[in-house]
Amino acid sequence: YSYEDACDYGITGCVEPSPQGKIGGRFGASFPNHTKVLELTLNDGKDPRTGLQLCKGNGNLTDFKTFDDFVEAFKKQLNFYLKHHIIADNIIDLSWEELIPNPFLSSVIEDCIARGKEIKQGGAKYDYTGGQSVGIISCANAIATLKKVVFDEGLITLEQLKHALDTNFEDNTTNPTGEEIRR
Protein backbone atom coordinates (compact mmCIF):
# COMPACT_ATOMS: atom_id res chain seq x y z
CA TYR A 1 0.00 0.00 0.00
CA SER A 2 1.02 3.61 -0.39
CA TYR A 3 1.69 5.46 2.86
CA GLU A 4 -1.53 7.44 2.48
CA ASP A 5 -3.59 4.32 1.82
CA ALA A 6 -1.98 2.49 4.74
CA CYS A 7 -2.93 5.35 7.09
CA ASP A 8 -6.57 5.21 5.94
CA TYR A 9 -7.28 1.62 6.89
CA GLY A 10 -10.01 -0.37 8.56
CA ILE A 11 -10.21 -3.96 9.70
CA THR A 12 -11.78 -6.32 7.18
CA GLY A 13 -13.37 -9.33 8.82
CA CYS A 14 -11.51 -10.13 12.03
CA VAL A 15 -7.88 -9.25 11.49
CA GLU A 16 -7.01 -7.95 8.02
CA PRO A 17 -6.03 -4.24 7.86
CA SER A 18 -7.20 -2.88 4.51
CA PRO A 19 -7.28 0.54 2.81
CA GLN A 20 -10.93 1.53 2.72
CA GLY A 21 -12.71 1.67 -0.62
CA LYS A 22 -9.64 0.53 -2.56
CA ILE A 23 -9.46 -3.21 -2.14
CA GLY A 24 -11.02 -6.18 -3.88
CA GLY A 25 -9.50 -8.96 -1.81
CA ARG A 26 -11.17 -12.02 -0.43
CA PHE A 27 -10.02 -12.80 3.06
CA GLY A 28 -9.99 -16.19 4.69
CA ALA A 29 -10.30 -18.12 1.46
CA SER A 30 -8.62 -21.17 2.95
CA PHE A 31 -7.82 -22.11 6.51
CA PRO A 32 -4.57 -24.10 6.71
CA ASN A 33 -4.49 -25.87 10.08
CA HIS A 34 -0.94 -26.03 11.43
CA THR A 35 -1.90 -28.35 14.28
CA LYS A 36 -3.25 -30.85 11.75
CA VAL A 37 0.05 -30.63 9.86
CA LEU A 38 1.82 -31.45 13.14
CA GLU A 39 -0.43 -34.49 13.65
CA LEU A 40 0.35 -35.66 10.11
CA THR A 41 4.08 -35.15 10.73
CA LEU A 42 3.93 -37.37 13.81
CA ASN A 43 2.22 -40.13 11.81
CA ASP A 44 4.41 -40.41 8.68
CA GLY A 45 2.09 -38.07 6.79
CA LYS A 46 -1.02 -40.21 7.44
CA ASP A 47 -4.20 -39.00 9.03
CA PRO A 48 -4.60 -41.31 12.05
CA ARG A 49 -8.41 -41.23 11.81
CA THR A 50 -8.83 -41.82 8.08
CA GLY A 51 -5.56 -43.46 7.08
CA LEU A 52 -5.28 -41.08 4.12
CA GLN A 53 -1.81 -39.94 3.16
CA LEU A 54 -1.36 -37.07 0.71
CA CYS A 55 2.31 -36.42 1.43
CA LYS A 56 4.66 -39.23 2.44
CA GLY A 57 6.31 -38.30 5.69
CA ASN A 58 9.79 -38.82 7.06
CA GLY A 59 8.64 -41.50 9.48
CA ASN A 60 6.50 -41.79 12.58
CA LEU A 61 7.14 -39.92 15.80
CA THR A 62 9.26 -42.77 17.14
CA ASP A 63 11.54 -42.65 14.07
CA PHE A 64 12.93 -39.17 14.77
CA LYS A 65 16.39 -39.50 16.32
CA THR A 66 16.91 -35.78 16.87
CA PHE A 67 14.79 -32.68 17.15
CA ASP A 68 16.27 -31.53 13.83
CA ASP A 69 14.93 -34.73 12.21
CA PHE A 70 11.48 -33.81 13.47
CA VAL A 71 11.81 -30.19 12.28
CA GLU A 72 12.77 -31.34 8.77
CA ALA A 73 9.78 -33.69 8.66
CA PHE A 74 7.46 -30.90 9.85
CA LYS A 75 8.81 -28.46 7.26
CA LYS A 76 8.22 -31.04 4.53
CA GLN A 77 4.58 -31.50 5.53
CA LEU A 78 3.98 -27.78 6.11
CA ASN A 79 5.45 -26.81 2.73
CA PHE A 80 3.31 -29.44 0.97
CA TYR A 81 0.06 -28.30 2.56
CA LEU A 82 0.74 -24.56 2.29
CA LYS A 83 1.55 -25.02 -1.42
CA HIS A 84 -1.83 -26.70 -1.89
CA HIS A 85 -3.62 -24.01 0.11
CA ILE A 86 -2.12 -21.39 -2.21
CA ILE A 87 -3.35 -23.39 -5.20
CA ALA A 88 -6.81 -23.57 -3.62
CA ASP A 89 -6.78 -19.82 -2.91
CA ASN A 90 -5.88 -19.13 -6.54
CA ILE A 91 -8.72 -21.36 -7.75
CA ILE A 92 -11.13 -19.54 -5.44
CA ASP A 93 -9.80 -16.20 -6.67
CA LEU A 94 -10.29 -17.12 -10.34
CA SER A 95 -13.71 -18.61 -9.64
CA TRP A 96 -14.89 -15.42 -7.97
CA GLU A 97 -13.56 -13.39 -10.89
CA GLU A 98 -15.31 -15.52 -13.51
CA LEU A 99 -18.47 -16.69 -11.76
CA ILE A 100 -19.54 -14.04 -9.25
CA PRO A 101 -19.99 -10.60 -10.80
CA ASN A 102 -20.41 -7.80 -8.30
CA PRO A 103 -21.44 -4.60 -10.10
CA PHE A 104 -22.81 -2.79 -7.02
CA LEU A 105 -19.66 -3.28 -4.95
CA SER A 106 -17.58 -2.34 -7.99
CA SER A 107 -19.45 0.97 -8.22
CA VAL A 108 -18.30 2.04 -4.75
CA ILE A 109 -14.69 0.84 -4.91
CA GLU A 110 -12.22 3.46 -6.07
CA ASP A 111 -10.76 2.94 -9.57
CA CYS A 112 -13.30 0.34 -10.80
CA ILE A 113 -15.34 2.81 -12.86
CA ALA A 114 -12.24 4.65 -14.12
CA ARG A 115 -10.70 1.34 -15.21
CA GLY A 116 -13.97 0.03 -16.59
CA LYS A 117 -13.54 -3.24 -14.70
CA GLU A 118 -15.35 -5.03 -11.92
CA ILE A 119 -13.73 -5.34 -8.53
CA LYS A 120 -12.57 -8.92 -9.13
CA GLN A 121 -11.37 -8.31 -12.68
CA GLY A 122 -8.67 -5.78 -11.90
CA GLY A 123 -10.86 -2.78 -11.10
CA ALA A 124 -9.73 -2.25 -7.52
CA LYS A 125 -6.38 -0.62 -6.77
CA TYR A 126 -5.46 -3.54 -4.50
CA ASP A 127 -6.60 -7.12 -5.01
CA TYR A 128 -5.41 -10.25 -3.27
CA THR A 129 -6.61 -13.38 -1.57
CA GLY A 130 -5.23 -14.63 1.71
CA GLY A 131 -5.68 -17.71 3.78
CA GLN A 132 -6.23 -17.49 7.51
CA SER A 133 -3.89 -19.97 9.17
CA VAL A 134 -5.30 -21.61 12.28
CA GLY A 135 -3.72 -23.51 15.13
CA ILE A 136 -0.37 -21.73 14.89
CA ILE A 137 0.00 -21.06 18.62
CA SER A 138 -1.21 -24.55 19.61
CA CYS A 139 1.23 -26.02 17.11
CA ALA A 140 4.13 -23.89 18.38
CA ASN A 141 3.34 -24.81 21.99
CA ALA A 142 3.22 -28.51 21.11
CA ILE A 143 6.54 -28.34 19.26
CA ALA A 144 8.19 -26.44 22.13
CA THR A 145 6.86 -29.03 24.59
CA LEU A 146 8.07 -31.91 22.42
CA LYS A 147 11.53 -30.35 22.25
CA LYS A 148 11.75 -29.69 25.97
CA VAL A 149 10.15 -32.84 27.39
CA VAL A 150 11.60 -35.40 24.96
CA PHE A 151 14.74 -34.04 23.31
CA ASP A 152 16.15 -31.53 25.84
CA GLU A 153 15.23 -32.98 29.24
CA GLY A 154 14.47 -36.61 28.35
CA LEU A 155 11.50 -36.76 30.75
CA ILE A 156 9.71 -39.23 28.47
CA THR A 157 10.67 -41.20 25.38
CA LEU A 158 9.23 -40.80 21.92
CA GLU A 159 7.61 -44.22 22.37
CA GLN A 160 5.87 -43.10 25.57
CA LEU A 161 4.66 -39.92 23.92
CA LYS A 162 3.41 -41.82 20.86
CA HIS A 163 1.46 -44.24 23.09
CA ALA A 164 -0.02 -41.34 25.08
CA LEU A 165 -1.11 -39.59 21.88
CA ASP A 166 -2.53 -42.79 20.39
CA THR A 167 -4.59 -43.44 23.54
CA ASN A 168 -5.61 -39.79 24.03
CA PHE A 169 -3.65 -39.74 27.31
CA GLU A 170 -6.21 -42.12 28.84
CA ASP A 171 -3.97 -45.14 29.53
CA ASN A 172 -3.28 -45.09 33.26
CA THR A 173 -1.47 -48.44 33.27
CA THR A 174 1.79 -46.99 31.95
CA ASN A 175 4.58 -45.30 33.85
CA PRO A 176 4.26 -42.38 33.56
CA THR A 177 0.51 -42.55 33.04
CA GLY A 178 -1.17 -40.81 30.14
CA GLU A 179 -2.58 -38.26 32.56
CA GLU A 180 0.88 -37.55 33.98
CA ILE A 181 2.26 -37.05 30.48
CA ARG A 182 -0.63 -34.76 29.56
CA ARG A 183 0.11 -32.49 32.52
Q: Residue locations for each model-derived region?
A:
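Conserved catalytic cores of very large enzyme subunits
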Residues: Y1-R183
